[in-house]
Amino acid sequence: MSWRWQAPVYSPVSPRALIHGIGAACGALRTGDETVIEVLKSRYDAIDVLLTDSGTSALILALRATVPPGGTVAYPGYACIDLTSAAVGAGVKVRLYDLDPETLSPDLESVRRVIQRGVDAIVVAHLYGYPADMGAVQALAADQGIPVIEDAAQGAGGTLHGRRLGSIGSMGILSFGRGKGMTAGSGGALLARTPASAEWLRQTRETLGTPSRGGGEIVGLAAQWLLTHPLLYRLPAILPALKLGEMVYKPPRPPRTMRLAALAVLQTALRTDHREVRARCIRASDLLSRINGASRLRAISPVVGGKPGFLRLALVDAVGDMAPQVTLGAVRGYPLTLEQHQQLRPFLAPGEQAGTGSAFLRDRLFTVPTHSRVGASDARRLSDWIATRIHHVLPRGARKTEREKAWRHA
């Protein structure tokens, strides 16, 4: 048995970034947000950018900007539990649309129906770095004048028709938390791409207060840098109290501006992120070459024009009896659909259901790591794990339609 234990996701942080963060946290390094804002405006084609203490805070603010008091937002039926936290924090009613489990993109017929049921805004989330079909959703929403918020917290350097994920919606959400591909330890950003939303950002910026120094970010980042090494990750991973890899609800807090330490780290991360994106894509391509044509384990297909950033490589268990291999970082996706989130139920409109595609993803989706700490020996172990599953023999008659039947006729 190998001692190595691979983290499912890892966001690199350099010693230089940690030093800058320590300097900002101690007050020895003066850090302004102007440089970061200008870089993000250019990178994401935004009129203005509001830096926040988390991606959840950025989404709360986006909901406040687009959904009137007592209004309703449309959410994907399968997504991160932070969407629930944002809905609770914004106090909005939620309706659900389904996802296509072939692509992780919105099921457009389901989007059409949720619009007919009545919503004031639609949130589209890119999952695991896979692009969602923003253009198709925007076309449906435009007929009713409904804004589309692009949640690119997991965009991870992916693109859609050559545009970076996060640069497409009328408002965009970024997250710089640990495990999001590019990290500052914490923090998020709200991107405005219309004059009206930019003016709303300008007014809101004055209400978020002055930034705290944020020494906790540096402690957390240093711990991540050390303990996510494959030779050490086994130690925190076996401690139940840490809940590593689990879906944990975090109650919303009043949105604040980004902490100074996180801002200092982010300045460095923005200059090096492209290298990690390229490395993830190379690892994903290698693993995908081993899956091509398999019937037992299938890869999620990007939407037309989409190029994933592969925060993780997403795979579907066509039979439904596959077990995770946590020491390899091969784990299941989110264990609940949004309608099953206990905290969301008071905010869920009557009769709303996640849909069969979302339920299928809950039951069948696996992700495997692609990050830069996946070494050659880890890649071989992952390849061996994949090989033992793609050669699994499906029951007679199930090979061709097993996955399709499972979600379309549920």
Describe each PLM feature range.
Residues 2-9, 178, 189-210:
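Active-site-proximal region of nucleotide-activated glycan assembly enzymes
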Residues 102-199:
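Active-site phosphate-binding strand-loop segment of PLP-dependent enzymes
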Residues 62, 86, 133-137, 187, ...:
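A short acidic, amphipathic alpha-helical/loop segment
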Residues 37-39, 43-50, 55, 79, ...:
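PLP-dependent aminotransferase class I/II
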Residues 62-115:
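Conserved PLP-anchoring active-site segment centered on the Schiff-base-forming lysine
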Residues 88, 138, 142, 324-327:
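Anion (oxyanion) recognition and catalysis
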Residues 3, 7-57, 78, 280:
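Conserved N-terminal alpha-helix of the aminotransferase class I/II PLP-enzyme fold
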